Structure formats: C-alpha cells, structure tokens
C-alpha cells in the first residue's frame, strides 16, 4: 500500500489540520498555493538544489561508525551526518526552501521561533543570504542556555527577541512568533522550524527535510546492497526524524524508531515525552499529541536539550504511531549525556545533545540485533553549542 498523507485538509488521520484565526487563513492558503506551484516549477527546484549542494554542502556522508558498532556489539551503525551541513544541523535544509518560497511570494521579511538556537541561526543565515529582514523569537530561558547562538544570530543581522511569557521556552517563542506574523502578515513569511503548525507547514517541512532520508536510502543501498533493518532519530517537534523516516515509509521491512526526551524520567514531571505521556489537543494551529494537565492546560516540557523541550509533536508522528508504522521510545538526560561522551570517545564526533538521545537508543537497539543487520541513525547536529552546558554539568557532578 502506498502511503498518502496528508489529505486535502491537511489531516494525517485525526491529527494535523488547520486551526488558525481568520487573520492567518489567507496567508496559510497563499503559502499552500505557492508551495504546490513550486513543486512543479523546474526553475525553483533547480535553484533549491543549487543552494543545497553549493551552500549547505549536500549530500552529507553516511558514515559507518565502526568503533561505536564494536562497542554496541551487534548491528552495523551508520550515522547520517547532518552535523556536517553549513550551520551544523539539519535545520538549514528547511530554511533554504522556505526562504526561496518567501521570495517567490514577494515577502522580504521572515520571522521564526527557536529553542536550541539552531533553527534561529539557520533562518538568520538564509535571511542574510537572500537579503531579508529577520526577527527571531526565543524563550528567555533558552536565551540564557544558548547565549552563543544568540550572538551568532545577531552577527548574521537578525533581531533576537527574548520572550518572557509563560515558561520562557520554545512553546512561548512559537506563540509570540505567531502573534508577530498575524500583525505583519502582508510582507512577512513565518519560517516554521519543525513539522508542526497549521497545514501546510508540517508537509512543507517534511518535504524539505526528506532530503535526509532520500540520500540515506540511496547511500545505504550502495554500501550494503540492501535497505537498513532500522532507522533511528531523535524527536522534539520531529523534523529530522520525519526527514529520515518519510522516504522509507513504504519500505515495510525498515523499522522506524523515534526517540523522545525523558528528561529526569517519565515518572517525574520533568520530561518532554509527548508520544508516551501526551493526549490529543490543539497546539499552535494543529491537532496533535500534547503534554497537558487534567484541565487541558499545556504542561511545561523539560529536557537537558533545548531543541527537544516542546510539549507537542508533529501530527504525522502521532499518525505513524497509530498506524504502527513507527515506534517511539524515550531517553533520559543522564543517558543522553552518556551517549554524548561515548560518541566523542569512540568516533571523535561531538554530537548535539538532541542527537545524543538517538545515539543512546541506537546503541541499545544495535546490541539486540545481529551483526549482519544494519541501522541508520540521524546525527541531526553537532554539539559545539552544548559543550559549555555539559562542562558545567560534569564539573557540578565532580564537585558534589
């Protein structure tokens, strides 16, 4: 059966859709039309591919992690090296595409939200490249955690707005960015950073990130002569995971594993495991699994990794879970930090804390598989941004 989603109303089963105020409906429909037109526009696709190759540096390698594989003692572990993209993460695959779309629609200003700062940096980068005015909303807590990325965005010419409302994290930054878009919708495009938000955003972001899985599928076939038995990626909103998963969706022999942030543990209040612990609700314009209390109030998500502490999850991930097409697991802060150090020492690669969640689960999974089997893990970003935070954490542990 060939997988086809979303439907014409933007639903993935019961998830997704378009729940936006009237003021945004026109902009969302305009975006939908521009996006559909761009898919069959040869000049647009040629330009997109040009920038992905010459500017982002694609395709990224599919690297056989020999020492990590030996450590796990099971299946071969291949790393899809999204950390080697310009700006150091998968985020730029999407921002390049959306900036070109914005230009196509005649919009000279862009706005975005950011958690870890990676999407903010990737948005500020393409805004500089295409000479656009750029405003980034970031929760005050994240501004503190990721001060280096804030400075990077400012260097690139973006205006960074620190959001002091609510939990002062990603969810609140999205709220403020959406408000800003409503007020400036005529000349501004909202570059959504993940497979979230009202239709067509989840579909657009999925399609621009699918380059990850398309390349990985081809590369793995070249290296192993077969498809991998499993693919693994971390999930916050879920764009790097969807980018890896989507091109494999009709390959039923390939198991798909998403890894959420369990923070201090699923039994505590301090986690961001939306699929494990969430319930269906509407957040930021779409129906999705959401962390909420018994009164339907959105709970604060928590993770050591700023890029994973979102209280919702892309609607298509919830749909994959319901279909039984993908499985979702969770990894604690401590396990992610352990995997971070493990990859540094075994492969000489410093991964992002987000990606470390995927590495942690991948090592567990590989150890239960046979040596003639293999898996692809999305190394969604590099860890430069996290080194300081980790230094403080590990020094704190030594001093205790």
Swiss-Prot record:
Its cofactor is pyridoxal 5'-phosphate. Pfam families: PALP. The modification N6-(pyridoxal phosphate)lysine is found at residue 91. Coiled coil: none annotated. It is an enzyme of class 4 (lyase). Keywords: Amino-acid biosynthesis, Aromatic amino acid biosynthesis, Lyase, Pyridoxal phosphate, Tryptophan biosynthesis. Its EC number is 4.2.1.20. Gene3D superfamilies: 3.40.50.1100. InterPro entries: Trp_synth_b_CS, Trp_synth_beta, Trp_synth_beta/beta-like, TrpB-like_PALP, TrpB-like_PALP_sf. Pathway: Amino-acid biosynthesis; L-tryptophan biosynthesis; L-tryptophan from chorismate: step 5/5. GO terms for molecular function: tryptophan synthase activity. It catalyses: (1S,2R)-1-C-(indol-3-yl)glycerol 3-phosphate + L-serine = D-glyceraldehyde 3-phosphate + L-tryptophan + H2O. The beta subunit is responsible for the synthesis of L-tryptophan from indole and L-serine. Tetramer of two alpha and two beta chains. Belongs to the TrpB family. PANTHER family: TRYPTOPHAN SYNTHASE, TRYPTOPHAN SYNTHASE-RELATED. This is Tryptophan synthase beta chain. It comes from Listeria innocua serovar 6a (strain ATCC BAA-680 / CLIP 11262). The gene is trpB.
């Amino acid at each position: 059966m060939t997988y086809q989603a979303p439907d014409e109303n933007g639903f993935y089963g019961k998830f997704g859709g378009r729940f936006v105020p009237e003021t945004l409906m026109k902009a969302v429909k305009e975006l939908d039309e521009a996006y559909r037109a761009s898919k069959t526009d040869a000049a647009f696709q040629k330009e997109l591919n040009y920038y992905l190759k010459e500017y982002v540096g694609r395709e990224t390698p599919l690297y056989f992690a020999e020492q990590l594989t030996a450590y796990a003692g099971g299946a071969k572990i291949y790393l899809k090296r999204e950390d080697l993209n310009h700006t150091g993460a998968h985020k730029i695959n999407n921002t390049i595409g959306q900036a070109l779309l914005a230009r196509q629609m005649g919009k000279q200003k862009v706005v975005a939200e950011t958690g870890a700062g990676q999407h903010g940096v990737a948005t500020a980068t393409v805004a500089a490249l295409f000479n656009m005015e750029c405003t980034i909303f970031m929760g005050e807590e994240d501004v503190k955690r990721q001060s280096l990325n804030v400075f990077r965005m400012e260097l690139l010419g973006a205006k960074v707005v620190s959001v002091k409302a609510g939990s002062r994290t990603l969810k609140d930054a999205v709220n403020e960015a959406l408000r800003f878009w409503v007020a400036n919708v005529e000349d501004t495009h909202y570059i959504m950073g993940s497979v979230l938000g009202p239709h067509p955003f989840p579909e657009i972001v999925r399609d621009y990130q699918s380059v990850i899985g398309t390349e990985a599928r081809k590369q793995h076939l070249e290296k192993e002569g077969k498809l991998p038995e499993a693919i693994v990626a971390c999930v916050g909103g879920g764009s790097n995971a969807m980018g890896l998963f989507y091109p494999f969706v009709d390959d039923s022999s390939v198991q798909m594993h998403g890894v959420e942030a369990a923070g201090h543990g699923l039994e505590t209040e301090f986690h961001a495991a939306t699929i494990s612990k969430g319930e269906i609700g509407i957040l930021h314009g779409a129906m999705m699994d959401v962390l909420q209390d018994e009164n339907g109030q959105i709970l604060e998500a928590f993770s050591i990794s700023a890029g994973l502490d979102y209280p919702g999850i892309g609607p298509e991930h919830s749909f994959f879970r319901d279909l039984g097409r993908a499985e979702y697991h969770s990894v604690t802060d401590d396990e992610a930090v352990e995997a971070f150090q493990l990859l540094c020492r075994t492969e000489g690669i410093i991964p992002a804390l987000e990606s470390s969640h995927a590495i942690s689960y991948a090592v567990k999974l590989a150890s239960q598989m046979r040596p003639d089997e293999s898996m692809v893990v999305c190394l969604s970003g590099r860890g430069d941004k996290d080194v300081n935070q980790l230094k403080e954490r590990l020094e704190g542990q030594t001093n205790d």
